[in-house]
């Protein structure tokens, strides 16, 4: 009944997968059921998208973390990614190859991309992708003075097995950075 009453709304779900080793058997079964059911709802269009996050993957991306600051550090990595992607989705890029996401591409995760090397680290491991969107946040100085930037980004887009698009957004930050949204139509199995 609840899902029927919100069917007309665009709902995005952020699913944070806890480390399986920290869960009791009943909790593992609950996580598995919830995880799969929410993905099926996203695939069927009940949800606009489900963004998958794996605390273990985020922890590995960050590096060594103290126990006292563990969850705070994870949150300080995840929240800015989501915030910047939301800001960029509502901003005009300086250059863009973005088109609409495919209707079937509702199971998603996020990544951080090294602007110089193109190395990508995802916050949830994904083998199967059908499209990826890259959000390059580039400072004004680099946009004006770096003659290699455009070719570097184009080169990073080549060789991708999935449909890839990018947007370049001007920022006032000293460092350039890039986030990715990785989409799939396939359910992730636990």
Q: Where do the PLM segments sit?
A:
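Tubulin/FtsZ superfamily GTPase core signature
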Residues: 1-190
């Amino acid at each position: 009944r609840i899902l029927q009453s919100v069917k007309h709304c665009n709902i995005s779900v952020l699913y944070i997968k806890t480390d399986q080793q920290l869960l009791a058997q009943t909790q593992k079964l609950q996580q598995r059921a919830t995880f799969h059911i929410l993905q099926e709802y996203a695939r069927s269009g009940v949800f606009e998208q489900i963004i998958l996050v794996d605390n273990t993957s985020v922890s590995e991306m960050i590096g060594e973390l103290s126990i006292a600051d563990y969850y705070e550090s994870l949150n300080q990595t995840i929240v800015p990614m989501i915030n910047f992607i939301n800001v960029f989705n509502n901003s005009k890029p300086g250059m863009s190859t973005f088109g609409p996401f495919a209707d079937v591409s509702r199971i998603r995760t996020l990544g951080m991309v090294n602007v110089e090397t193109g190395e990508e680290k995802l916050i949830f491991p994904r083998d199967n992708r059908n499209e990826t969107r890259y959000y390059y946040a580039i400072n004004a100085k680099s946009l004006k003075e770096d003659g290699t930037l455009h070719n570097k980004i184009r080169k990073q887009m080549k060789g991708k097995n999935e449909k890839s698009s990018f947007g370049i957004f001007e920022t006032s930050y000293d460092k350039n950075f890039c986030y990715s949204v990785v989409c799939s139509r396939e359910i992730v199995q636990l």
